[in-house]
Structure formats: structure tokens, C-alpha cells
Amino acid sequence: MSKVFHTQNLQFKKIEPRLPEFIWNTSPRFAKLADSKHLEFDIRSLDPGRFSFPFHFHRASEELFFILSGEATLRSPEGFQKVAQGDLIFFEEGPLGAHQLYNHSDVPCVYLDIRAMFGIDVCEYPDSGKINILPFQEVFEINSKVDYYKGEEQVASKWPQEIIRKPSESYIG
């Protein structure tokens, strides 16, 4: 079933995170209203002098911006460039798809943000050394990376002793 969203009189909700540099405005979550299974999409408005999300990339999601009005400066691995009304910007998965917008102008920059979502995504923030497990919003520092088997040394102690064989009883094949 098709869903039509009339955006002429769109009401934005202000999102005010802890750092004022990242205040932005968003439309309703159109993807939820459409019951979308693999796309997230909404319209965002970035006020003058504000940054979009911190510089980041997705490990399991592609993203697409379409600038509806205004202009901003895009930061990507290629450097900095101005984007304006009518520009379509694609961000691939991984470090080469890293991105961030800054509204350098005197008017809001309004853009459609479309993201492919196929389950869990890991969003990485190169500037601050964090990862974010999406959609759960669980944020961790990258430098806390550990060996896969860390803390598993006592695995047998979690099992009933009558089930566990002594190492000398182990099968050697």
C-alpha cells in the first residue's frame, strides 16, 4: 500500500542534545508511519551555525541526503565542499562514507535523509573514537576493544560438574 506524506506544512520537532552545536530539527519519522521494513527516512532542518550529527560512518547502512532548500558545507574523507538545494549526496558503508554537515549560511538547510536498515548497524565516530550500536543507541569507546575469549577462561565452572569431563578424559582424534 502506498503512503503519501504531504510536506507543505511540515511541523519540525527540535532535538536538543547535550551539546548546543548539534541542535537540529526533524520531521515525524516517516518510515515508522509508513511501516517501512528496510528504510529509515525523514526530513531534517539544520539551523545556521549548527552541525548535523558528529562526523560518522555506518558499517552496515548506506545513506542518502537530498538538499530540499538552503545550503551547507559537507565534511567527508575527500575534504569540505558546499552542497545546496537540488544536490543529492550518497554515503557508502564504511570509512569512505563518513560525513557531517555544517550550516554555514544564514538560512536553514532542509534535507531529506534516507538510510537503508537491515537489522543492526554499527555507527563509528572517527573524531571521538566511539561506536554506536543501532537501533539500540548503545555507545562505547573503541579503545575498549578486547580479545574474543577474554573472560571465558572459566567456562567449565558455569556447567554442572557431572557433565564436564576432565581434560585427561577428553577425546583425542
What are these model-derived regions, one by one?
Residues 52, 62, 69-71, 78, ...:
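A generic structural motif
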Residues 31-39, 50-63, 79:
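A short beta-loop-beta micro-motif enriched in histidine and acidic residues
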Residues 43-47, 58-74, 114-116:
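Short, conserved beta-strand element in jelly-roll/cupin
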Residues 24-27, 42-58, 96:
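Conserved short histidine dyad/triad with adjacent acidic residue
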Residues 77-94:
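Short acidic-glycine-tyrosine-enriched beta hairpin
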Residues 48, 85, 116, 127:
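Active-site donor-binding loop signature of nucleotide-sugar glycosyltransferases
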Residues 93-121:
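Ligand-binding loop in jelly-roll beta-barrel domains
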Residues 1-38, 124-173:
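A short, N-terminal "cap"/entry segment at the start of jelly-roll beta-barrel domains
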